[in-house]
A protein has these predicted regions:
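Positively charged, small/polar-rich N-terminal and surface patches that mediate targeting and assembly
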Residues: 28-29, 79, 84, 115
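Beta-strand/loop substructures that line and gate deep hydrophobic ligand-binding cavities in soluble
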Residues: 58-93
């Protein structure tokens, strides 16, 4: 499992979410948006997206859960967590696929934020 968290200022929540929904699947021939959920309560909102892609290194599929939260005009809190790319039964071996998926998302996010 690999985790990335970032606080994002001066971005529109919906615009950033839509760009990530489009760019993450476009970044890999096997990546797909599998599911999503949105919550809103007063000025607070939270969006969760689950992406999945094939890991050539691990020979399996792994997931990335993207969570974005914002309360009113406060900064956006983003969390990205990958899972499922390791091998073995009792301990984690070969998490390279998880780390690579997360690195790709970090790079995409930086490109989007530089626009």
């Amino acid at each position: 499992m690999a985790i990335f968290e970032k606080t994002i200022r001066n971005q529109k929540f919906n615009t950033l979410l839509r760009k990530l929904e489009q760019e993450i699947p476009d970044s890999s021939w096997s990546a797909d948006l599998e599911a999503g959920s949105d919550f809103k309560e007063g000025e607070a909102r939270c969006s969760v997206r689950v992406f999945e892609r094939y890991s050539v290194v691990g020979g399996n599929r792994l997931s990335l859960t993207l969570t974005m939260f914002q309360n009113g005009d406060s900064p956006i809190r983003l969390s990205a967590i990958t899972a499922g790319g390791s091998q073995a039964v009792f301990f984690k071996v070969n998490t390279l696929g998880e780390e690579a998926f997360l690195d790709d998302v970090k790079d995409l996010l930086e490109e989007i934020l530089e626009e």
